[in-house]
Design a protein with these regions (language model features):
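Short, charged, surface-exposed secondary-structure boundary motifs
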Residues: 74-83, 144-148, 280-287, 381-384
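Peripheral docking tails and interdomain loops at the edges
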Residues: 13-14, 357-397
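Metallocofactor- and cofactor-centric catalytic cores in central/energy metabolism, strongly enriched
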Residues: 25-39, 45-56, 75-80, 87-92, ...
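Acidic/His-rich segments in extracytoplasmic proteins that coordinate ligands and/or metal ions
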Residues: 93-164
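A charged, amphipathic alpha-helical module
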Residues: 8-44, 152, 156, 160-286, ...
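Redox- and metal-dependent alpha/beta enzyme cores, enriched for Fe-S-associated oxidoreductases
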Residues: 51-52, 57-69, 252-329
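A short, acidic, amphipathic alpha-helical segment used as a generic capping/interface helix at domain edges
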Residues: 98, 320-337, 354-355
Length: 397
């Protein structure tokens, strides 16, 4: 398989005709439209739901990795008939969208062993979506050498099931090619993030959110072309004069809506960086192309990716342990000149709930104030959140 060739029916020059940000907004507003078109062209669309989605393997199989998302503006009307209301509201909302047929173009899904809300509902996803392909990836939660070996075996099993399903052989060469494509995609996204270091940033947090969501639902080659177009467009902007607006970093998990970014920037701040699942967590760590592919992938997803469900044991002091888990956040704070952070966690998200005290104290110990927000995956209480954000910005002014 040559992933660099132009896909059938896709004129990549089209991205040059329609500016990158306009294209991203179109994909954001009509999420899944491009995947639906590719499905009609005969492509296999394989869904995933978190930063643990092994996108390189899906690409190597000739499939289109498609990240599932919910709709914060839509109430859960069917999902609660299948899942308890104490299940993470994000998971319930995504399942609700799925059971309503929002992602009817999906051929299959890879669901990771990550949190209780995913682990304990995997049978529900399998039994009620009735996809022709479903794979539960039993990702370990520790990062020692035996876990890396176990992860390699899990990826080998995933490859076998994908080969059987798609009919495409996933060789080391095709896997390396897919890894290279996704690494280049990550590099481009980091370049775009870098344009937020300016004061004021050249791209807003809301524009960035639309780009992040847009690229989750298209093939990696199209994603890279879109990011290039956005970079070119944003670089052409004339930098505005410096001002004293506060520079905010958003921390959280499955945040994929402009409602929160609009609330932050509408209150008079710049959203300049994030540590969220669809954002920097997806793009900051590459797969080592000099190592054997399965080993490199295992190390990337277990050791390099910093998520609450992975236990990092340094064997050192408490401070060393905190640095191993959250040190990247301090680097972001320094690099992007962050004045304040907003830690936004969904109700019933136990992994992040347990991490909140440690994250909050770690960041505050660096002299950066933290606003902790806990809410549903919904815009129903947005007014209350806006009030708290405004008060926080006044406090740190």
């Amino acid at each position: 398989l040559d992933f660099r060739e132009k896909k059938r029916g896709v004129d990549m020059a089209e991205l040059g005709v329609e500016k990158g940000l306009a294209k991203a907004e179109k994909y954001y507003n009509d999420y899944g439209k491009r995947a639906n078109e590719l499905k009609a062209e005969g492509k296999k669309i394989i869904g995933y739901i978190s930063a643990l989605g092994p996108v390189e393997v899906l690409t190597a199989a000739g499939a289109v990795p498609f990240r599932l998302k919910g709709n914060v503006d839509e109430a859960i009307t069917k999902g609660d008939a299948y899942m308890e209301t104490i299940v993470c509201p994000f998971v319930r909302n995504v399942f609700d969208s799925s059971i309503k047929g929002k992602f009817s173009f999906l051929d299959g899904m890879v669901l990771p062993h990550q949190c209780d809300s995913l682990d304990r509902t995997s049978d529900v996803w399998r039994d009620y979506l009735k996809l022709s392909y479903f794979h539960f990836l039993n990702v370990p939660h520790v990062t020692d050498d035996p876990s890396i070996e176990f992860m390699k075996e899990l990826l080998q099993l995933l490859i076998k099931t994908l080969e059987d399903y798609t009919g495409n052989k996933i060789s080391n060469d095709t896997l390396k090619q897919a890894i290279s494509l996704h690494n280049e995609n990550r590099r481009l996204m980091r370049e775009l993030y870098g344009l937020r270091k300016n004061n004021p940033p050249l791209i807003s947090g809301t524009e960035m959110m639309k780009v992040l969501v847009a690229v989750m639902g298209i093939p990696v080659n199209e994603s890279s072309e879109l990011i290039k177009a956005v970079i070119e467009e944003v670089k052409a902007r004339k930098p505005a004069a410096d001002n004293d607006k506060k520079r905010i970093m958003l921390i959280g998990d499955q945040i994929d809506s402009v409602s929160i970014t609009d609330a932050i920037e509408g209150a008079g701040a710049y959203l300049v960086m994030d540590d969220i699942s669809i954002g920097s967590k997806m793009y900051w760590q590459d797969v080592d192309e000099d190592k054997e592919p399965l080993l490199a992938l295992s190390e990337r997803y277990l050791r390099k990716l910093k998520i609450p469900t992975t236990f990092v044991d340094t064997g050192g002091t408490y401070e060393e342990n905190l640095n191993a888990r959250f040190g990247h956040m301090r680097k972001y704070i320094d690099e992007f000149k962050v004045n304040g952070t907003i830690l936004f966690v969904y109700k019933y998200c136990d992994p992040y709930g347990f991490e909140v005290p440690a994250i909050k104290s770690y960041i505050e110990s660096a002299g950066v104030p933290v606003l902790y927000l806990e809410d549903e995956y919904s815009t129903s209480s947005l007014a209350r959140m806006k009030t708290r954000i405004e008060a926080f910005l006044e406090m740190i002014a």
